[in-house]
Amino acid sequence: PSSAASDVYKRQDEPLSNLDAKLRVQMRAEIIKLHHRLKTTTVYVTHDQTEAMTMASRLVVMKDGLIQQVGTPKDVYENPENVFVGGFIGSPAMNFFQGQVKDGYFVAGENKIKLSPEKASLLNGQGYNGKDIIFGIRPEHISADPEDLTRTPESVVNAHVDVCELTGAEFMVYSTLGEQQYVARINADSLLETGQNIQLTFDMSKAHFFDKETESRIR
């Protein structure tokens, strides 16, 4: 039966899960257009973070039945509340490194990466100097551009290209920092191939730091 509530509220539970990839993309666009035309409030349930990011005006990220974060797709992507959200939202996922904060640097094994002044002040102010911590950074915030390497020399690491995947406009470059694997999203104009030794730099203004015990973002 129709009611005022049913006219303004719709719930869709993984409606695209059984479609092939191409049709899923097409149907995403159709659902978005339908939603804007009908102006209904729709709760869309999905395990596909790409669907969530592209279709939602607001996201509710849940784990084991508990809400982890609520916000716009942009805010959730750029400011994840914890390691779970950072690792779930985004493809490829956020990179995570275990290490320590030491006198303005993030240290993982023999690698030292200089913190931005803002992050150094935040972490020192919260008492994390000398403590174990989790450092997170998105693949697109790791660069092989010569200008970036020159501009931020204290954020540069030596990297061996374990795997290099060309996706068209970009390379997905897989390497390791210490024993921790990570992926960098590099412009395809760079001349890269598997097996190379290269240098990469981390944009530490885009870095996130998480408490090792709680896995919550430090802010």
Where are these regions (language model features)?
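Single conserved hydrophobic/aromatic residue that forms the stacking wall/gate
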Residues: 1-5, 9
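Helical segment within the ABC ATPase nucleotide-binding domain
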Residues: 24-39
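Conserved H-loop
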Residues: 39-46
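Hydrophobic Walker B segment
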Residues: 53-56, 88
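Short, glycine/charged-rich "phosphate-handling" switch motifs in NTP-dependent
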Residues: 58, 70, 79
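Conserved ABC ATPase "signature" C-loop
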Residues: 64-65
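Short acidic-hydrophobic catalytic motif
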Residues: 74-78, 86
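Glycine/charge-rich catalytic "coupling/switch" loops of P-loop NTPases
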Residues: 105-162, 190-219
